[in-house]
From Swiss-Prot:
Motif (Nuclear export signal): 147-163
Cell compartments where the protein resides: Nucleus; Cytoplasm; Cytoplasm, Cytoskeleton
Ranges where the record places region Interaction with KRT14 and KRT18: 222-289
Domains as described in the record: Requires the intact death domain to associate with TNFRSF1A/TNFR1.
A GO term for molecular function: identical protein binding
Name of this protein: Tumor necrosis factor receptor type 1-associated DEATH domain protein
Keyword Signal set for record: no
Domain Death: 215-305
Keywords: Apoptosis, Cytoplasm, Cytoskeleton, Nucleus
Keyword hit for Cytoplasm: yes
Cystine pairings recorded for this chain: none
Length: 312
């Protein structure tokens, strides 16, 4: 197949994920009708899907439908590898486990047991999961019939504002997700920097910059531009982040090799954010970029670069 604009093969498909609580007292479609809970639940879905399938460039939510008592999430897959990884996570129960934990935190409950169902067109894929090739063909046969819903863009902005707020709010895509397996090799304890305080700044090229936790847009900008140097940045970050210590970077490189440099870099920052929470700050990333002579990327990340390459 021909390569797409982002280097991804032109393999596109669509499926619907049906999500329902097993608890009578928890009706997800009703909870999603309330704006504050809607933002938190969107963040929970986004986090679980990113962990199971990859970045929004390869696995994207197009629309979230309310259908009492369920939520129905329309998904778009760009790339066979990402779809295969999602199917594996769904089949093995990893998606369900992650989503249950994320939704429980979003709704401030001890637990939210879920019933999931996956469909592509008329095919109910749960009965076909042992035949991955057939599932892939069913999903590929269903082309997305819409663009991303504008409401999801609004929810993404609201979620980003929560992430950047002074209090780590519910539904943040940087909170509460399980940290990945860490290296078994003994390592000295690192000094964890404190979370940023409201209005706290750091200096970049003599300019004061407001520090804040990293958000999804930061991760996407970094992944688009860092290229082969993502591992060098990872080595800088691992000095104060145990979750990135060896063999974590080699594992990321191997696991996402077929998805390309964008996905490897995106997953690096996603793992950093998962492990560090609100301590995964703009300042720490910018310092790692400067250390590796990636000043122009830091300028782009901070919004300081003009289109002609000069500082704003």
């Amino acid at each position: 197949m021909a390569a797409g604009p982002n280097g991804l093969e032109e393999w596109v498909g669509s499926a619907y994920l049906f999500v329902e609580s097993s608890l009578d007292k928890v009706v997800l479609s009703d909870a999603y009708a309330h704006q504050q809970q809607k933002v938190a639940m969107y963040g929970a879905l986004q986090t679980a899907l990113a962990e199971s399938g990859g970045s929004p460039d390869v696995l994207q939510m197009l629309k979230i439908h309310r259908s009492d008592p369920q939520l129905i999430v329309q998904l778009r897959f760009s790339g066979r590898q990402a779809c295969s990884r999602f199917l594996r996570a769904y089949r093995e129960g990893a998606l369900r486990a992650t989503l249950q934990g994320c939704l429980a935190r979003a709704l401030a409950l001890n637990s939210v047991p879920l019933q999931l169902e996956l469909r592509a067109g008329a095919e109910q894929l749960d009965a076909l999961l042992t035949n991955e090739e057939r599932c892939l063909n069913c999903i590929c046969a269903q082309k997305p019939d819409r663009l991303r819903d504008e409401e999801l863009t609004e929810l993404e902005n609201a979620l980003r504002n929560l992430t950047c707020g002074s209090a780590g709010g519910q539904g943040s895509d940087v909170q509460g997700t399980p940290a990945p397996l860490q290296s078994l090799a003994p390592s000295p304890p690192e000094e964890k920097p404190p979370p940023p305080q409201p209005g706290q700044t750091f200096l970049f090229q003599g300019q004061p910059i407001v520090n804040r936790p990293l958000n999804l847009q930061d991760q996407q900008k970094f992944a688009r531009s860092v290229g082969l140097k993502w591992r060098k940045v990872g080595r800088s970050l691992q000095r104060s982040c145990r979750a990135l210590r060896d063999p974590a970077l080699d594992s990321l490189a191997y696991e996402y090799e077929r998805d390309g440099l964008y996905e490897q870099a995106f997953q690096l920052l996603r793992r950093f954010v998962q492990a560090e929470g609100r301590r995964a700050t703009l300042q720490r990333l910018v310092e790692a970029l400067e250390e590796n002579e990636l000043t122009s990327l830091a300028e782009d990340l901070l919004g300081l670069a003009n289109p002609d390459g000069s500082l704003a």
